[in-house]
A protein has these predicted regions:
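N-terminal domain-start signal
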Residues: 1-210
């Protein structure tokens, strides 16, 4: 067993020990205000007392993506890293169709945010993954025909993301593929329950089906 693997395993175990327990989550939920919640987070090892939540969360995201990239041997973790790209793609596409300025991006995944932005604005999408190309083209076509809907855009990007992740799982192995398949199934159940509670018809649920 290589020392590199042992080091990586130790890093993961260290982070696992810092995960929020059910009691810690309840403590945050019970906080009277943002100040008290910030103090609780600091005591749990996340940020410093009084630090802005967005700063704490953004730093944690950046650290996690950096760790995944550091440990990404042969692209085995690409399926996990690329999720950050789809968060950014969704932000950029929503800004593109609304004419607003895109802000508050997730950390760069396999692609730079600027690369995604330039591809959307210029139409030069050949350097992107096929799933990304397809969802960009579909969004642009919907925009041209006046058929863009925020919910539909969310669903289109989510479908592209999971299709891409399942494809990348060829480099990750069986366990990763099973993980993403379970996530997809949980999302289907969540979508069905949401549609049921809101009294929406089957068509709405079917459109969300990944």
């Amino acid at each position: 067993m290589s020392y590199k693997f042992l080091y990586q395993n130790a890093q993961i175990k260290s982070r696992e020990s810092k995960l929020l327990t059910a009691q810690a989550v309840q403590r945050l939920l019970d906080a009277a205000d943002a100040r008290e919640a910030s103090k609780a987070l600091a005591e749990l090892g996340f940020g410093t007392d009084g630090e802005n939540f967005d700063v704490v969360f953004k730093r944690a995201e950046e650290e996690n993506i950096a760790l995944l990239k550091e440990m990404n041997e042969g692209g085995a973790l690409d399926a996990f890293i690329v999720e950050s790209d789809y968060v950014n793609l969704k932000i950029l596409l929503k800004a593109y169709v609304s004419g607003a300025k895109a802000e508050s991006f997730a950390p760069n995944g396999l692609f730079e945010v600027e690369t995604l932005k330039e591809a959307i604005e210029s139409g030069e999408i050949s350097l992107l993954a096929k799933q990304m190309q397809d969802v960009i083209l579909k969004t642009q076509e919907n925009l041209a025909s006046g058929q863009v809907k925020a919910h539909a855009l969310d669903v289109d990007v989510d479908k592209a993301q999971f299709a891409h992740q399942l494809e990348l799982c060829k480099k990750s192995g069986k366990v990763a593929k099973e993980y993403f398949e379970k996530r997809i199934n949980y999302l289907k159940i969540s979508s069905f329950e949401r549609a049921r509670r809101l009294g929406l018809d089957f068509t709405f649920f079917a459109d969300c089906f990944i």
